[in-house]
Amino acid sequence: VPLEEDPANKWYQRAGFPLELSGREKKKLDERKAEVMPEDTACIMFTSGTTSRPKGVMLSHFSLVNNSAEIARQMHWSQKDKLCISVPLFHCFGITAGILCCIHSGAQAHLLKYYKTVDVLEQVEKYRCTVLNGVPTMFLAILHNQNRSQYDLSSLKSGIIAGSPVLPVEYQEICRELGMKHLQVSYGQTEASPCIAISDYEDSLELKSHTAGRPIPDIEFAVQQSDVIRNESMEG
């Protein structure tokens, strides 16, 4: 087996190939790890934010790793879970609350190339997915799909609903119809990698339908008006 271009035309026997390769890979990994610092930029995510023109947001390794670890912990995800990832991977929702959370928790990741309601229904039924994240319009599209009753979605247990506001009556209907007791309402922004607040896992559906949750660890909130910090009970 030719491992790589070698001036001496060195070849490796099949039996020794895995050991040689793993040794080289470990050395490369150790060298790379020594070069990377937690505060270094891991990726650049684009967000339109308050304008229609996309802006690049530099997210650090520290921010992405810690945010996803906390999401996985708050959601109680484990190796027993299977995530149906239907949100795009070019967005924090897909990367942080999807791929990275699976790495932290050991959960399976089932990816969809594009979002189509019927594809989500088929994926959940086929792989018995336990977790489904999405924006309110995605959940409502599933809810109102005329063929939904033809699919077995009983495996769904939890997920995150975020990205835009959802009416209390709509949220409760989604939870009730899909049987998702632990569909957690969350608030975030790309600059925060993205989760800022999330409802408590054991909060009632009534409470979760009227709140975006509590701040996660290492997140600080401030109510501000005209550069003046306001009290918690005041508007800002």
What positions do the PLM features span?
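Conserved AMP-binding/adenylation subdomain of ANL enzymes
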Residues: 65-82, 90-131, 145-146
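Conserved S/T- and glycine-rich ATP-binding loop of Class I adenylate-forming
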Residues: 41, 47-50, 83, 89, ...
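Gly/Ser/Thr-rich phosphate-binding loop
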Residues: 129-134, 143-207, 220
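Conserved pre-ATP/AMP-binding loop-to-beta segment of ANL
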Residues: 7, 12-17, 23-46, 53, ...
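Short beta-strand->loop structural element characteristic of the AMP-binding/adenylate-forming
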Residues: 1, 55-58, 85, 107-114, ...
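Conserved beta-loop-beta connector loops within the AMP-binding
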Residues: 222-236
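ATP phosphate-binding P-loop of adenylate-forming
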Residues: 39-52, 57, 68, 72, ...
